[in-house]
UniProtKB/Swiss-Prot annotation:
GO terms for molecular function: 8-oxo-7,8-dihydroguanine DNA N-glycosylase activity; class I DNA-(apurinic or apyrimidinic site) endonuclease activity; damaged DNA binding; zinc ion binding. The active site is at P2, E3, K58, R260. Involved in base excision repair of DNA damaged by oxidation or by mutagenic agents. Acts as a DNA glycosylase that recognizes and removes damaged bases. Has a preference for oxidized purines, such as 7,8-dihydro-8-oxoguanine (8-oxoG). Has AP (apurinic/apyrimidinic) lyase activity and introduces nicks in the DNA strand. Cleaves the DNA backbone by beta-delta elimination to generate a single-strand break at the site of the removed base with both 3'- and 5'-phosphates. The gene is mutM. It holds the Pfam family zf-FPG_IleRS. The lineage of its organism: Bacteria, Pseudomonadati, Pseudomonadota, Gammaproteobacteria, Pseudomonadales. This is Formamidopyrimidine-DNA glycosylase. Its cofactor is Zn(2+).
């Protein structure tokens, strides 16, 4: 599943080509995504100028003069720019054609993504209960410490909870916990304030660096500009179970936490 850096990479790739452009028409070839695409999306969006392309957690917000298209890439979705009128292939479900002659094309083989319309996106039911963005001043180690008190849940699924902080998915939680030296199995309530301060710093650092590197390409993700990400070449823990730790050489172990695979170093993380 594309994580926050991949979604931000997509946003940065498509925004310069969308912002200020007027939509000429919307072509929906298959509306059967996680939730059905609104039947009147073409009527609502066509003729409007796109004001801004923003992101909230893993949702892309394509803001028009009146209303906002909320898009989620799901498990296998991607958005890329093509020439308007380019014949569509299988799984290319939606084209948003622009007066510039380009079209924003949404592809999603598994159809777990979303394209929804809202006049008040930040109060939409999918967004209203989300926690703070990790790369803002609203998120820090103090928040992690305070929210974790009394919790017996393992620290990794705790930091992956979107009510605590958004966008820290499996890949980046694994990497941040490795960098902070925290065993992902440790109870969230047992982690000290000092270690949460370190973890928050590492979450911010790793996410920012992954965005700079274009995200992490695993399986299906392709950025909005057609370029894959390269951060996967620098992973220390994620997907490396059974391999030697890049820091100490100890064999990395893999366990299941919250139904997700989690890799850690038994020597570097405690």
């Amino acid at each position: 599943m594309p994580e926050l850096p991949e979604v931000e990479t997509t946003r940065r790739g498509i925004a310069p080509h969308l912002e200020g452009q007027r939509v000429s028409r919307v072509i929906v070839r298959d509306s059967r995504l996680r939730w059905p695409i609104p039947e009147d999306l073409d009527v609502r969006l066509s003729g409007q100028r796109i004001v801004q392309v923003d992101r909230r957690a893993k949702y892309l917000l394509i803001q028009a003069e009146v209303g906002t298209l909320i898009s989620h890439l799901g498990m296998s979705g991607n958005l890329r720019l093509v020439e308007a009128g380019l014949p569509a292939l299988k799984h290319e479900h939606v084209d948003i054609e622009l007066e510039s002659g380009l079209a924003l094309r949404y592809t999603d083989p598994r159809r777990f993504g979303a394209m929804l319309w809202s006049l008040d996106p930040h109060n939409h039911e999918l967004l209203i209960r989300l926690g703070p963005e990790p790369l803002t001043d609203l998120f820090d180690g103090e928040r992690l410490y305070e929210r974790s008190r009394g919790k017996s849940i393992a620290v990794k699924p705790f930091v992956m909870d979107n009510a605590v902080v958004v966008g820290v998915g499996n890949i980046y939680a694994t990497e941040a916990l490795f960098a902070a030296g925290i065993d992902p199995r440790r109870e969230a309530g047992s982690v000290s304030r000092a270690r949460y301060l370190k973890l928050a710093i590492e979450i911010k650092r790793i996410l920012a660096y992954a965005i700079e590197r274009g995200g992490t390409t695993l399986r299906d993700f392709i950025g909005g500009d057609g370029k894959p990400g390269y951060f996967q070449q620098e992973l220390f823990a994620y997907g490396r179970g059974g391999q030697p730790c890049k820091v100490c050489g100890t064999t990395l172990r893999e366990v299941k936490l919250g139904q997700r695979a989690s890799v850690y170093c038994p020597k570097c993380q405690r």
